[in-house]
Every structure is written in C-alpha cells, then in structure tokens.
UniProtKB/Swiss-Prot annotation:
Its main location: cytoplasm. One of several proteins that assist in the late maturation steps of the functional core of the 30S ribosomal subunit. Associates with free 30S ribosomal subunits (but not with 30S subunits that are part of 70S ribosomes or polysomes). Required for efficient processing of 16S rRNA. May interact with the 5'-terminal helix region of 16S rRNA. GO terms for biological process: maturation of SSU-rRNA. Residues 126-157 are annotated as: Disordered. This is Ribosome-binding factor A. It holds the Pfam family RBFA. Belongs to the RbfA family. GO terms for cellular component: cytosol. One of its GO terms (molecular function) is ribosomal small subunit binding. Keywords: Cytoplasm, Ribosome biogenesis. Residues 145-157 have a biased composition (Acidic residues). The lineage of its organism: Bacteria, Bacillati, Actinomycetota, Actinomycetes, Bifidobacteriales. Monomer. Binds 30S ribosomal subunits, but not 50S ribosomal subunits or 70S ribosomes.
Length: 157
C-alpha cells in the first residue's frame, strides 16, 4: 500500500483531500451529509485507491444509513474519479473503491469495555480496603503454643 512508496503516499493524501472536499462542497446528496473520509490507501502501481470512510455519530450501528451512503458513494465514484484525475494531473487516475471504516465503531466498543473494567477494578479496590481475614491473620499460629521469641541463655556467664 502507500506505506512503501512515497509517491503513492502523496497521491493518497491528495485523493483524500479531493474526495473529502468534493463530498462536502460539490455532491449535494443528503445521504452523504455526515460522511468523513478517514484514510486513503493507494497501491504501489497507482491503479487502485481504497477510500475509507465513516459516518459521524453513527459508528456503523445504523446499517440502513450506512448502506444508503455506500450506494451514494458508488454512484458518485465516476465523478469523484474524474475530479481526482483533473486535480492530480495523473496520466492514469486510480480506480476508487469505497470501504466503510470499522475502526471508530470498534474503538467506541473498546472504550465501553475499558470503562466497565475500570469500574470493576475500583469496586475490587474498595472491597480490598475494607476486607478482613476470615480467621486469624496468621492461621498457623496458635495461642497455646510458645512463641518463637525465646532468649538464648547460653551466652551468659
């Protein structure tokens, strides 16, 4: 992907800017109102550009809205590709593939799981602070046994 080829990385950044600004300013489709382009990855041969997108505020939980947005992006794919070609000045414009970015939704779920774990840790710490032994502090020590603190009388003269 774009990580190994500096030219591919530059083109990916350009495609991200062009596609994001075009969705915001030129495409007047209500289905794309809350779309954000999160990343673009271009193959080293510059033939394919995967455009990762997400919907703000939805994190992928609204399946119907996500499908409608995907359809709108697929319909606008040709227009967006021509805009990229015009602004980039490339001999061959990469084919655009729109992929829903699952990372924000998964990150939200992970944050929820971590919050629950933190709450449980705090409850455990409070329980530990007030905990007492079920029996004696040292279950192996009995009151009827002599203590180990004996003095050695052999040194006295």
């Amino acid at each position: 992907m774009a990580g190994t080829n500096p030219r591919a990385a530059r083109i990916a950044a350009l495609i991200q800017r062009v596609v994001a600004s075009s969705i915001e300013r030129e495409l007047h489709d209500k289905r794309l109102a809350s779309i954000t382009v999160t990343e673009v990855r271009v193959t080293n041969d510059l033939q394919i550009a995967k455009v990762y997108w997400t919907q703000l505020g939805h994190e992928g939980h609204e399946e119907g809205e996500r499908k409608r947005a995907q359809q709108a992006l697929d319909q606008a794919k040709g227009h967006l590709r021509s805009l990229v070609g015009h602004k980039a000045g490339l001999r061959l414009t990469p084919q655009l593939q729109f992929v829903f970015d699952e990372v924000p939704g998964e990150a939200h779920e992970i944050e929820d799981i971590l919050a629950v774990a933190k709450k449980r840790d705090e409850e455990l710490a409070r329980a530990r602070a007030t905990a007492q032994y079920a029996g004696d502090a040292d279950p192996y020590k009995h009151d009827d046994e002599p203590s180990d603190d004996f003095e050695d009388d052999s040194d006295e003269e």
